[in-house]
Amino acid sequence: MSSYFLNSTFPVTLPGGQESFLGQIPLYSSGYTDPLRHYPGAAYGGSSVQEKAYPSSFYQQANGAYSRATAAGPCDYATASFYREKDPACALASIEEHSFVLSQDHRKTDCTGSTGKSIYPEADEQKPSAPVYPWMQRMNSCNGTFGNAGRRGRQTYTRYQTLELEKEFHFNRYLTRRRRIEIAHALCLTERQIKIWFQNRRMKWKKENKLINCSQTSGEEEEEKRTE
């Protein structure tokens, strides 16, 4: 099979006095335009070239487009390049990418509701609260050992504190503020606790005296009836 390319060592003149035709054919042609233009009937592989030949302007335009593409370099797909003047192919790619990013952002906003809550419950799950142990709750509540912290629990007094308070109540049923502060410091109690204890103790004492008086009056009346 004969090669279409021409060798540089091929003789310029042919035997038999024929004129050289290599001067009309360039050895290094781009796009192979000149051989087809000057010799449309040249043989290729033992068969003649068809009468239909591409014009030279077609190859020149192709070479020009290729040279511009190589000189321009790779397309820049950055966001700022969207507003620049570029090759039509690069501009089209940047427009498509920009529209794709906007569609993704719009899709994300659609996934989240108007209240800002995501449609996926796994993302909105909160961390479990810390466990509450019995020793962390308030004691001495009215609803049992561990109850609500809204109401104040009943104060419990030790045996020593109760004995000292009873002694003081036996001598003085009403305390001055100075004496109340002294007893509170001595028994490691607050002034309010001392005040409440004496109030409750006086109410109890009044009830006891009332019962005693009622029993005495009822006993005297019975004795009077018997004597009559």
Curated annotation (Swiss-Prot):
Superkingdom of source: Eukaryota
Alphabetized Pfam families for the sequence: Homeodomain
GO biological process, one term: regulation of transcription by RNA polymerase II
Subcellular location(s) per record: Nucleus
GO molecular function: DNA-binding transcription factor activity, RNA polymerase II-specific; RNA polymerase II cis-regulatory region sequence-specific DNA binding
DNA-binding region: 150-209
UniProt entry tagged with the keyword Repeat: no
Gene Ontology CC: nucleus
UniProt keyword Transcription present: yes
Keywords: Developmental protein, DNA-binding, Homeobox, Nucleus, Transcription, Transcription regulation
Chain span(s) of sequence motif Antp-type hexapeptide: 132-137
Family: Belongs to the Antp homeobox family.
Function: Sequence-specific transcription factor which is part of a developmental regulatory system that provides cells with specific positional identities on the anterior-posterior axis.
Name the UniProt record assigns to this protein: Homeobox protein Hox-B6a
Organism, as annotated: Danio rerio
Gene name of this polypeptide: hoxb6a
